[in-house]
Amino acid sequence: MNLKDANILEEYIIKDIETGDDELDAFLFSLGCYSGEPITVISHLKGGCVVSIKDARYNIDNDLAEAISI
C-alpha cells in the first residue's frame, strides 16, 4: 500500500521509500521521511497529497506518494 491509497487522518508507519534517486532519498530523510517513521495523510489533492511528518506538513506529488510504501 502507498500514500495514494491511504485514508485521510489515519496514522501509518513508513515501510519503504523507492524513489530510484539517491538525492531525493537523502532529501526525504532530512525531512524525517524514512522507514519506521509515522506519517499521516491530511488530504488528497488532484496532483498529490498533503502529509504530516514529525508535526510538519508537506505537499507531495502523486509520483512521490506512490513511491512511499506504508
Region locations from a protein language model:
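A residue-level detector for short acidic-glycine micro-motifs
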Residues: 5, 16, 41-43
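Short, surface-exposed acidic/glycine-rich loop or hinge patches that mediate macromolecular interfaces
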Residues: 19-22, 44
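C-terminal structural segments of small proteins and small subunits
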Residues: 12, 42-70
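Intrinsically disordered, low-complexity, charged/polar segments
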Residues: 2-5, 66
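A structural micro-motif recognizing beta-strand termini
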Residues: 17-19, 30
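Short alpha-helix capping/helix-loop boundary micro-motifs
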Residues: 23-27
